[in-house]
């Protein structure tokens, strides 16, 4: 699948655009250190945008009926994405909780795969958080879902305000975790506990 996506990128067009960008900033794209840069950057972005055209809910291919009705939490799922405003990285951790309905659970790796698909595209952290939650709701129809994403944005570290180390936290709650503040707080405390 990865190879398919890499092949679907218009490499020639991407390489030409990067070549022109280097010229636009006053660089010589024909100098030794930059000769292969357009090709390398196009290949890198093809990999970083593997999630384009994919739906994160399609990652939930394994759904099992178990006698489990209590919360399931997977925390600390590392990810990186590209800010769609500045095309620089943001990266961090996603924490996912869901309360199974009728014992429907999924493979734990499927949660990480959904994060991967949703993050590998030009993205906003707020949208990323919602897309992960919505994919889980559509795939499993749980009683409740809560997604928390903590990330550092290079657009705040490298430019503008220049505040390295600052983290942005976003949450999205669905079902019981949206309706009940007490239930939501309990799950958040489990997510943030070391």
Curated annotation (Swiss-Prot):
Tree of life domain: Bacteria
Keywords: GTP-binding, Hydrolase, Metal-binding, Nucleotide-binding, One-carbon metabolism, Zinc
Protein's pathway: Cofactor biosynthesis; 7,8-dihydroneopterin triphosphate biosynthesis; 7,8-dihydroneopterin triphosphate from GTP: step 1/1
Enzyme type, top EC level: hydrolase
Keyword Metal-binding: yes
Species for this entry: Streptococcus pyogenes serotype M49 (strain NZ131)
InterPro entries in alphabetical order: GTP-CH-I_C/QueF, GTP-CH-I_N, GTP_CycHdrlase_I, GTP_CycHdrlase_I_CS, GTP_CycHdrlase_I_dom
Subunit note: Homomer.
Family statement drawn from the similarity comment of this UniProt entry: Belongs to the GTP cyclohydrolase I family.
EC number: 3.5.4.16
The keyword GTP-binding is annotated on this UniProt entry: yes
Gene Ontology CC, one term: cytoplasm
Gene that produces this protein: folE
Name of this chain's protein: GTP cyclohydrolase 1
Reaction it catalyzes: GTP + H2O = 7,8-dihydroneopterin 3'-triphosphate + formate + H(+)
Gene3D superfamilies in alphabetical order: 1.10.286.10, 3.30.1130.10
One example GO MF annotation: zinc ion binding
GO biological process: one-carbon metabolic process; tetrahydrobiopterin biosynthetic process; tetrahydrofolate biosynthetic process
């Amino acid at each position: 699948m990865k190879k398919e996506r890499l092949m679907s990128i218009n490499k020639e067009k991407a390489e030409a655009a990067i070549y022109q960008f280097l010229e636009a900033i006053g660089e010589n794209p024909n100098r030794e250190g930059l000769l292969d840069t357009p090709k390398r950057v196009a290949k890198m972005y093809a990999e970083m945008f593997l999630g384009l055209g994919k739906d994160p809910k399609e990652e939930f291919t394994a759904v099992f009926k178990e006698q489990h009705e209590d919360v399931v939490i997977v925390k600390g799922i590392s990810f990186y994405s590209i800010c769609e405003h500045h095309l620089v990285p943001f990266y961090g951790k996603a924490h996912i909780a869901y309360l199974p309905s009728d014992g429907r659970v999924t493979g734990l790796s499927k949660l990480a795969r959904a994060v991967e698909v949703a993050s590998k595209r030009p993205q906003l952290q707020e949208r990323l958080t919602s897309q992960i939650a919505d994919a889980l709701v559509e795939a499993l129809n749980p009683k409740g879902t809560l997604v928390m994403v903590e990330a550092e944005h290079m657009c705040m570290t490298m430019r503008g305000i220049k505040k390295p180390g600052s983290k942005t936290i976003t949450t999205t709650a669905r079902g019981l975790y949206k309706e009940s503040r007490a239930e939501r707080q309990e799950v958040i405390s489990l997510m943030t506990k070391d």
